[in-house]
Amino acid sequence: ENSLRLTANTGHIKYFVDRLWACWSEYVSHYSILDDVGHFHIRMIKLQKTLPGEGYHQWHFESDNMDRAGRIAAWGCYLNTVDQGGETEWLYQGIRIPSIQGNLVIWPAAFTHTHRGNPPLSGEKYLLTGWIEL
């Protein structure tokens, strides 16, 4: 597996987590029902490296079993720009978000947002990813 688990102990990771929470607050402002849910947390941050032609191409969603039922949302932060391929694609929304350095995407973890990572075609893809959980 081309991933690494990171903790929020270093300054750069803490800075990123603070920015992620700021984005989450903006997300919640659009879906006010989440105000009543309570505390959210980020259990882990994964750093993924995807080589050309690789990726997680299978359609999936993030809360697909009881162990993952506490996942409210998934997120991904693109660490580099991929010129061809490497998009995150959502099945039912019919959209593809390209891998552009610095972009952060947050989406519901439920089956309504079934998605996949398309393979990068023109170089490696680097991504921080994880979940907002109850």
Describe the role of every protein-language-model region.
Residues E1-L104, T112-L134:
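Fe(II)/2-oxoglutarate oxygenase catalytic core
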